[in-house]
């Protein structure tokens, strides 16, 4: 068993390198990086290469990057933005040695859409993303969200979508 730290639990209390060092000190061998924290680190002058070095020095593995959100029911413009963001995330994962990108289905489902249609759309979205992710050696993990408006709210829904993929 591997202890993995979910960075979401401290997302505003420190810097990414500090979080990684604290993970190592607490005995965690892996960390689930948060996309927002990674972007804040990079905007502050950090680099992906420096972060990878920090991970290596601390003997902490980047287990996953959380998350590409609203991957289903995209408009044309939203789909283009999602493709650009996903390519960047997959490239970042490759640099960081992170083999998994979490994805979250849409929160904006058109009125009257059936559960079967949600399943098909989410499965199709995962298939489109998985082709690009594979080019970077990245796997996708579908995360369900038990929140109002979420189109995928249960483990059973995730399993059904993955069966359709």
Regions found by a protein language model. Give the residues of each.
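Glycine-rich, proline-tolerant flexible connector loops at the mouths of alpha/beta enzymes
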Residues: 32-56, 105-114
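Boundary/entry segment of secreted carbohydrate-active catalytic domains
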Residues: 1-15
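Transmembrane beta-strand segments of Gram-negative outer membrane beta-barrel proteins
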Residues: 1-3, 60-63
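Catalytic domains of carbohydrate-active enzymes, especially glycoside hydrolases
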Residues: 17-36, 96-97
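Conserved, mostly hydrophobic/aromatic
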Residues: 5, 23, 31, 55, ...
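Short, well-structured secondary-structure segments
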Residues: 29-35, 61-65, 101-102
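Active-site beta-loop-alpha junctions enriched in small/polar residues
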Residues: 6-10, 34-38, 67-70, 106-108, ...
């Amino acid at each position: 068993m591997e202890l993995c730290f979910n960075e979401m639990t401290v997302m505003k209390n420190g810097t990414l390198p500090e979080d990684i060092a604290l993970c190592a000190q607490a005995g965690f061998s892996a960390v689930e990086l948060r996309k927002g924290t990674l972007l804040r680190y990079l905007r502050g002058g950090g680099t992906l290469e420096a972060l990878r070095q920090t991970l290596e020095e601390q003997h902490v593995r980047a287990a996953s990057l959380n998350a590409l959100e609203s991957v289903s029911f995209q408009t044309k413009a939203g789909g283009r933005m999602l493709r650009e963001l996903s390519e960047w995330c997959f490239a970042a994962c490759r640099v960081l040695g992170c083999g998994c990108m979490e994805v979250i289905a849409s929160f904006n489902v058109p009125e009257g859409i059936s559960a079967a249609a949600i399943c098909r759309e989410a499965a199709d979205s995962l298939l489109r993303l998985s082709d690009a992710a594979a080019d970077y050696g990245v796997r996708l993990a579908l995360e369900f969200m038990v929140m109002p408006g979420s189109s995928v709210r249960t483990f059973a829904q995730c399993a059904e979508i993955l069966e359709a993929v």
